[in-house]
């Protein structure tokens, strides 16, 4: 479900402008390992249809943060306390009350790939289900920072989704590198509201089915899995994550406060 990079975008001048503008204005796990069961209790498995999954993070008892390109509907199921994609006694299955895609989400540029989902019922917090708190500030993540991302997506480009939760350690890559001709080449532009992360040698990445998974850097929630290249784990196209900037955090808090 993690998006692959799209066709040629706007002009280079426009792309450079997008990269430099300030905050204002409106995948599968490759190269990772299966986690200890229920050791990531904040993870939410999103079953959007019989054969489509995404992931998300439980940020309040009845709120999940995921990606805007995950097509959440009234019939979508949010499974908390999951290690396996199959039924487990620890799982809590909740349904959607209302979805709030980020209003400035752009399918073409991939800017603002965030979505808040309010659940019909509150989750029961226990050893298998826990809240992942939002960061206090939207501090940018420096290149070289170690991060981790988990999900139930593919662990190989031709594989089916993983039956169990997997996680991979990745490193933040400078946006200038991700935008150069050896990588995304500004198609699309990796802007200030995105985090580029993976391994410059390739082989470590999120993948299809990991969309919406939380990116944790130094143990802090910093991003949401958004898109990547045609092939997961390809060194030319590291994974790209929506950065939880102050602008995004303010929107999240406003939506949750206004929907009480």
Swiss-Prot record:
The keyword Disulfide bond is assigned to this record: yes
Enzyme class, broadest EC rank: hydrolase
Tissues showing expression: Found in cytotoxic lymphocytes and in normal lymphoid tissues such as thymus and spleen.
GO molecular function term, any single one: serine-type peptidase activity
CDD domains reported in the protein's UniProt record: Tryp_SPc
UniProt catalytic activity: Hydrolysis of proteins, including fibronectin, type IV collagen and nucleolin. Preferential cleavage: -Arg-|-Xaa-, -Lys-|-Xaa- >> -Phe-|-Xaa- in small molecule substrates
Domain Peptidase S1: 29-257
PANTHER family: GRANZYME A, KALLIKREIN-RELATED
Function statement: Abundant protease in the cytosolic granules of cytotoxic T-cells and NK-cells which activates caspase-independent pyroptosis when delivered into the target cell through the immunological synapse. It cleaves after Lys or Arg. Cleaves APEX1 after 'Lys-31' and destroys its oxidative repair activity. Cleaves the nucleosome assembly protein SET after 'Lys-189', which disrupts its nucleosome assembly activity and allows the SET complex to translocate into the nucleus to nick and degrade the DNA.
Protein name: Granzyme A
């Amino acid at each position: 479900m993690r998006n692959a990079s799209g066709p040629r975008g706007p002009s280079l001048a426009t792309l450079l402008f997008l990269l430099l503008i300030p905050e204002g204005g409106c995948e599968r796990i490759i190269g990772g390992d299966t986690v200890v069961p229920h050791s990531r209790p904040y993870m939410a498995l999103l079953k959007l249809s019989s054969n489509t999954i995404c992931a998300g993070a439980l940020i309040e008892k009845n709120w999940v943060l995921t990606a805007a390109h995950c097509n959440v509907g009234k019939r979508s199921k949010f499974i908390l306390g999951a290690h396996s994609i199959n039924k487990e006694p620890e799982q809590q299955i909740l349904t959607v009350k209302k979805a709030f895609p980020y209003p400035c989400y752009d399918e073409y540029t991939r800017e603002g790939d965030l979505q808040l989902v309010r659940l019909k019922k509150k989750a029961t917090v226990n050893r298998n289900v826990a809240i992942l708190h939002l960061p206090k500030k939207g501090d940018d993540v420096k290149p070289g920072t170690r991060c981790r991302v988990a999900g139930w997506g593919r662990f190989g480009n031709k594989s089916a989704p993983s039956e169990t939760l997997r996680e991979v350690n990745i490193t933040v890559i400078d946006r200038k590198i991700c935008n150069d001709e050896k990588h995304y080449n500004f198609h699309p532009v990796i802007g200030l509201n995105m985090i580029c992360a993976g391994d410059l040698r390739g082989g470590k990445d999120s993948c299809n089915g990991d969309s919406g998974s939380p990116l944790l850097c130094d143990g802090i929630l910093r991003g949401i899995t958004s898109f990547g290249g045609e092939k997961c784990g390809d060194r030319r196209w590291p994974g790209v994550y929506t950065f939880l900037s102050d602008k995004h955090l303010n929107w999240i808090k406003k939506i949750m406060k206004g929907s009480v």
